[in-house]
Amino acid sequence: MKKRRRKQKFDKQMQKKLLGVFAFVLLVLVILNLKIAYINIKSGDKYAKQVLSQKEYDSRTIPYRRGEIQDRNGNVLARSEKVYTVILDCKAVNEKEAYLEPTVQALASSFGLDAVKLRSLITAEDTKNSQYQVLKKKVTQEEKDAYEASISTSDENLTKEEINQRNNVKGIWFEESYVREYPMKSLASTVVGFSNDLSDGFVGLESYYTDVLNGVNGREFGYLNEDSELQRTVIEPENGYSLVSTLDVNIQQIVEKYIKQLDEELSDGSNQELNGHGAKNIAVIVINPKTGEIYAMATNHGYDLSDPYNVSSWYDQDEVDALSEEEQAVVYNDMWSNFCVSYAFELGSTFKPITVSAALETGSINPDDTFYCDGYEFITDTRINCDNINGHGMETVREAIQNSCNDALMQIGYRLGVEKFCKYQRLFNFGSRTGIDLPNENIGSLYTTENMHEVELATNTFGQGFTSTMIQEIAAFSAVVNGGYYYQPHMVKQIINDQGGVVKTNDPILLRQPISESTSKVLQEALEMGVLYGTGKKAWVPGYRIGGKTGTAEKINPETGQRWSGRYIVSFIGAAPIDDPEVVVYSVVDEPNVEDQTQGGYPHIMSRKILMEILPYLNIPATEEYTDEELAEYGITREEAEAGRITETETPETDENGNVIQSADSQVADNPNISNPPAEKTDEEQQEGLPDNAGITREDLAAE
């Protein structure tokens, strides 16, 4: 049985002590309250103002404007336009009943908002005290100006009732922001790319240069000073820098016109996977071989930059909308990717000029050497055929290029050897990024001296067995025909601030000289023979000396790793004028939608059409005569041949100052730093100075 706990009792002495402590605490509290009351009466206003002066009022962000993207002539490809968000302070409207209807009517009439929904929003229990309700986004400057004009009409023009109505519009204010606009819609879409409302760049220049295009937001602060007066402090935004690209919208439009024409011409083929298109990919690059500047770059996967998630031109939009996010990402990536820089494939015979250049430069062959083609070569018991299985017979080096002879190239490769072949692949920058200022550049894949054997060497000589991108090939080919100088291809000429001042100029970058001018001269002659008499005849342009090379590559089935019977990438790369090239055009057609993909000369003809328009546009004169019979052979009328044509004897148009008016820049200012070719570099040194694909930042510019 538990004992009962006795109640604890304080003795009288302890009770007196507790009472004393309680009395003391009570006295202190009374004194503190009296002190607070005294301070409040005597100095309350002073301290209230000090508190108010430390409190922030009416603080807002002032958004920066993202920089523009222009072509080389100042045509705007991307820009940011100021827009406004309509904000409503419901609490301010509810201060008086008289404010409700005038405010609702002003919003409804000026911005097309529903009056019933507005009344409900303003008076609803959960929003009536809200001071921040977004009513409408992306309101234009014109809409905002019209609203402000409607509530600032002079009293002289209004009745008393209308004045009261106007003065009772309360709680409406605006926040500034910017939206990205693309005035030329889909033009150069895979190059320009797009950005979202948060100024995050997606693909293209918008992505690569996003840190340069972006600026820094400003801020406006409002404070009450000690006199309870509102003072404002404004930190202005720093707008983003703008890009002056190397693109020429006129050349870009010409290129895209003929891509579209070919896409439509072949669209009736039987390949249902192409969704009514003429080929899986059709792509063209136009470059200045003397500077590395890209005049045009386009594919048949263009899309409206203002509506990039609309992929209905290639896919069933309803089916895409039903996919998971991961599956949609695959579709969008396929649509937005740039075939010219991100897709690596076997080049085929367009690589042959590089093999011959290397053999000539190393002395492995001489320009006057001859080779006998019997239609095939046996390489370690493996028979490798020439395209002409009956053989071309005896050929010179130039004729081997003209005839696109695999047999002769294998013999040349044997003389060159594995070590030198691999070295010159690297010297021409295959297997490495070119450093072009676009994201997601593919480096392709090469054999090394360790894993390349006789068969691999033989097939590599004519562009089979390794992969390359279009940008790698056109940069290398430009070096073959321009005297031997390898320039880094680039997309941006200048970076400018929002006042138009130049922040940075991207001068041409000469990386190396893999071959001599004398070797380049031999290749110029061989490539011209290929257009006049060989496989590139369909690329002939009346009045101009054109040199070029065709290419046909059987694709690899990614599932089996074997040759994909009947599926080809066909191409043509050409320079004009071939004796002193000002422009190089590279056209690729991936799986044309026809029964026999190797026939038809589609890229050759497309290249010819492009050159026929851009050569006169670039003020490059026609120097060669031609006959009606020659025109008829290629299905060209004399009117087409002479449209826009200029000759060396014609006087160019000049301005009032006597300066020649040029419709496009075919040259850039002389750069004393690149007038002489650099000394030959080691393999490691060749990679130095080649930027990675991370993109340039504002900090990079500030550090220069």
Q: What is each model feature region?
A:
Residues V502-N506, E629-I636:
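Intrinsically disordered, low-complexity charged/polar segments
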Residues M1-Y315, E419-R426, A539, E559, ...:
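Periplasmic/cell-envelope proteins involved in peptidoglycan metabolism and beta-lactam response
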Residues A78, Y84, E125, L224-V234, ...:
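Beta-lactam-recognizing serine transpeptidase/beta-lactamase-like catalytic domain environment
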